[in-house]
Amino acid sequence: RHLGVNWEKSTLRGGLPRIATTLQKGGVTCNVTLSLQSTNQDTLKAIKRSNLPINDFYAFKSSLHDQHLHTYTELILGLPLETYDSFAAGINQVMSPRLEGSYCIYLCQMLENTELNTEISRKAYQIETRLCKSTVTNRRYQESESQMREIEEFVVATSTMSLEEWKRAYLMGYFSIAMYNHRIAFFVMNYLRSEHGKNPIEFIEFLIDCVLENSVLFPRLYLGLSQIIQQRSLVLDGTSAMRVTDDSGGL
């Protein structure tokens, strides 16, 4: 059994481990959410957010892993003052060598009644967005177009991340999730970092270049990249932020 749990944030360092352990002992597996959103200090200041000091975050996550509690860390693509390099650095930081760890990437949304969704913020951070039919929170993705009535607004460029950089970050980010979370290159990336001092994203960027330049040599990886590129196009075209793509044996 797997239970999706929405954790109350104030329990993070207090009751959360005890609750997760109790569920685990009862035979219910659940992932513990660790939300960072960003590791870039300028970005955190802009969105008025404070995270645990990164060393405390590592220690807390490690303590959960020591109890065989699985975690996933949340990052957001498209936040103000985030750059391609700072976003990549954040992914490097959340990639744990432990099998209990994983992470996910959300696209920055312009939500009603938030400070980011004001003319002042839009102008200050030069925010460029796309309007997409709402599919992110739906559990069924086969609804007809007429059934998708809600529209969501996603950030695709800011003053510090151009549209081309956002596209690059999208491809790098979601490809890295496939390579890391599904353990396709998990051990390779950990070996390169441990033995040769190479950050995981260096390997991911190298792999993307190799696959795109030599698609015949890497057909499965190329198909996986193509699906990510297709999904990215759906966002940029304003079609959908999440849609099932054709599965022809890719990632």
What are the language-model segments listed below?
Residues 68, 98-101, 176-180:
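A generic secondary-structure signal for well-formed alpha-helical elements
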Residues 19-24, 84-99, 167, 171-173:
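Short, electropositive alpha-helical surface patch
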Residues 57, 71, 94, 131-133:
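Structured mid-domain segments that build the active-site/substrate or prosthetic-cofactor binding neighborhood
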Residues 153-251:
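Radical SAM enzyme core and accessory elements
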Residues 3-7, 89-94, 105:
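Phosphate/diphosphate-binding loops
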Residues 1-73, 77-79:
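Conserved SAM/AdoMet-binding glycine-rich loop
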Residues 53-56, 86, 165:
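An acidic site on a long C-lobe helix of protein kinase domains
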Residues 36-37, 41-48, 77-85, 97-163, ...:
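Flexible glycine/acidic-rich beta-alpha junction loops that bind and position SAM and/or redox cofactors
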